[in-house]
From Swiss-Prot:
Substrates-to-products reaction catalysed: Release of an N-terminal amino acid, Xaa-|-Yaa-, in which Xaa is preferably Leu, but may be other amino acids including Pro although not Arg or Lys, and Yaa may be Pro. Amino acid amides and methyl esters are also readily hydrolyzed, but rates on arylamides are exceedingly low; Release of an N-terminal amino acid, preferentially leucine, but not glutamic or aspartic acids
Gene giving rise to this polypeptide: pepA
Organism: Synechococcus sp. (strain JA-2-3B'a(2-13))
Record-linked InterPro entries: Leucine_aapep/pepB, Macro_dom-like, Peptidase_M17_C, Peptidase_M17_leu_NH2_pept, Peptidase_M17_N
Protein name in the entry: Probable cytosol aminopeptidase
Pfam families reported in the protein's UniProt record: Peptidase_M17, Peptidase_M17_N
Top-rank EC class of the record's enzyme: hydrolase
Length: 510
């Protein structure tokens, strides 16, 4: 999709998308926006007002009206924003996506989108609208065999012009916002496609190849550690999980450094990279559950998607992107329940459940990250079903002992629209991981499962500020909603980018 910036007003075009705030009272005749009311009276003989009245459109959130017309504007979409005082960037994204879905239903190829006057930061509004346009248009047809099937599943809208009031006064700022949206959406789409691809396509080797491609395209440093290198570093937890797979483990380390000048801060982003999780000898028995275990590398996908976006945006920040990639399979080499593994920080782990393998791979990844001397570590993982039970399928769980980091990540999530909710790191629950033969077990009681999982990870970070995002719920959706289509969402990429850019801005001001 091509995106352009231009000045209002609406003049002519195939399709116009116009935002509408909710009418006061909400039950009377809806007042059309002035620009549309004028067109309706002069060119459309009141057809728009009549249709709006018939359909009961009142400008409420998630509501819209789509019409075919004659004249210089041949198709029109009105989309509701609700109460202007309650409008958020995420509501603007969702309304934009709703409107573009309606434009798609009209088979529109070109859309003129008139940005509303709101209380939101206008530059941020342009970024949010552009993100929604690019993300709702994404269709993953890689594995369809026929051109006809691909055409039927493609998004009709190919070009959107954003009409921005006051564009001329701050065009450079708007162009920066547009480019940021383009790169963030591209990173999100990369993450979506990694998560959506089956485990026979996205293997540990394929993730490593993706990292190499990013390094080549964006000038990143890349280090891929194989079995022997990981053994030399004492990564017994990671390699314990990897033992049963016929595919070799790949420990991925991408590094971005500013081209000029010293970095204002150094950060590590760590993603869980289980390209398939059978459960191991504690095999998953639910056929639906095991079929979806291609998504168990959603954290790795978010980290690689963020690497793609941030390398293009070039912040003055040193960034380390880390993924311990492997499968959790069943074979004669598989770890047994009761085995003891030694992680690279020399802590020992009794494996009382082989289906709690992600935290084992993350243990060595976190130790590796801290040794890099970074200022903060953030890991993302599709870690626990318990978090999905607690927060549902749209919200990630945030765990951190660091108040500043918690606030930073919440602010980043507010900007991205990717929902997070902080859950407690209740230290007393670590008793549930106690072992009589090792330093800890890898799982505790069923109750508080997402908390004990986070407490387990905490044992592998000594001093560096650290946060953990459990993204098991929002990494996938079973319905078209907002700018996400059914399937992989690419969750986490935009929050990571917003967090890194905010850390850069804060460091530059200090």
């Amino acid at each position: 999709m091509q995106l352009h910036l231009s000045e209002p007003p609406l003049t002519q075009g195939e399709c116009a998308l116009v935002y509408c705030f909710a009418a006061s009272g909400g039950n009377g005749r809806f007042p059309l926006p002035p620009e549309i009311a004028s067109w309706d009276e002069k060119a459309w003989s009141g057809l728009v007002a009549e249709t709006v009245q018939e359909q009961g459109f009142q400008g409420k959130p998630n509501s819209s009206v789509a019409l075919r017309l004659t004249g210089e504007i041949r198709k029109l979409v009105l989309v509701g924003l609700g109460d202007p005082a309650a409008l958020t960037l995420e509501a603007l994204r969702r309304a934009t996506a709703n409107g573009l879905r309606q434009a798609h239903s009209l088979k529109a190829k070109q859309v003129m989108l008139s940005l509303p006057e709101t209380g939101l930061d206008r530059v941020r509004g342009v970024q949010a609208v552009a993100e929604a346009c690019l993300l709702v248009a994404h269709r993953d047809n890689r594995f369809k065999s026929s051109a006809k099937g691909e055409e039927e599943n493609s998004f009709s809208v190919q070009e959107v012009t954003l009409l921005v009031p006051g564009l001329a006064q701050a065009r450079p700022d708007y162009e920066v916002a547009l480019q940021r949206a383009i790169e963030m959406a591209a990173g999100t789409i990369l993450a979506r496609e990694l998560v959506a691809a089956p485990a026979n396509i996205v293997t540990p080797l394929a993730l490593a190849d993706t990292a190499r491609q990013l390094a080549q395209e964006y000038g990143l440093e890349v280090e891929i550690l194989g079995q022997e290198e990981c053994e030399a570093l004492g990564m017994g937890a990671f390699l314990g999980v990897a033992k049963a797979s016929d595919l070799p483990p790949q420990f991925i380390h991408l590094t971005y450094k500013p081209a000029q000048g010293d970095p204002v801060t150094k950060l590590a982003l760590v993603g869980k990279g289980l390209t398939f999780d059978s459960g191991g000898l504690n095999i998953k028995t639910d056929s639906r559950s095991i079929a979806m275990m291609k998504t168990d590398m959603g954290g790795a996908a978010a980290v690689l998607g963020a690497a793609r976006a941030l390398a293009a945006l070039k912040p003055q920040v040193e960034l380390h992107f880390i993924v311990a990639a492997t499968e959790n399979m069943i074979s004669g080499h598989a770890i047994h329940p009761g085995d003891i593994l030694t992680a690279s920080n020399q802590k020992t782990i009794e494996v009382n459940n082989t289906d709690a393998e992600g935290r084992l791979t993350l243990a060595d990844a976190l130790v590796f990250a801290e040794k890099l001397g970074v200022d903060a570590i953030l890991d993302l993982a599709t870690l626990t079903g318990a978090c999905v039970i607690a927060l549902g399928e749209e919200i990630a769980g945030l765990f951190t002992p660091d108040e500043t980091l918690a606030q930073e990540l919440q602010q980043a999530a507010n900007l991205s629209g990717e929902k997070i909710w902080r859950l407690p790191l209740e230290e007393g629950y670590f008793e549930g991981l106690s072992s009589i033969v090792a330093d800890m077990k890898n799982t505790g009681p069923r109750s508080g499962g997402s908390i004990t999982a986070a407490l387990f990870l905490k044992q592998f970070v000594e001093k560096t500020p650290w946060a953990h995002l459990d993204i098991a719920g929002p990494v996938w959706t079973e319905k078209d909603a907002g700018y996400n289509n059914k399937g992989a969402t690419g969750y986490g990429v935009r929050t990571l980018v917003e967090w890194v850019l905010a850390r850069q801005a804060a460091a530059a001001c200090s």
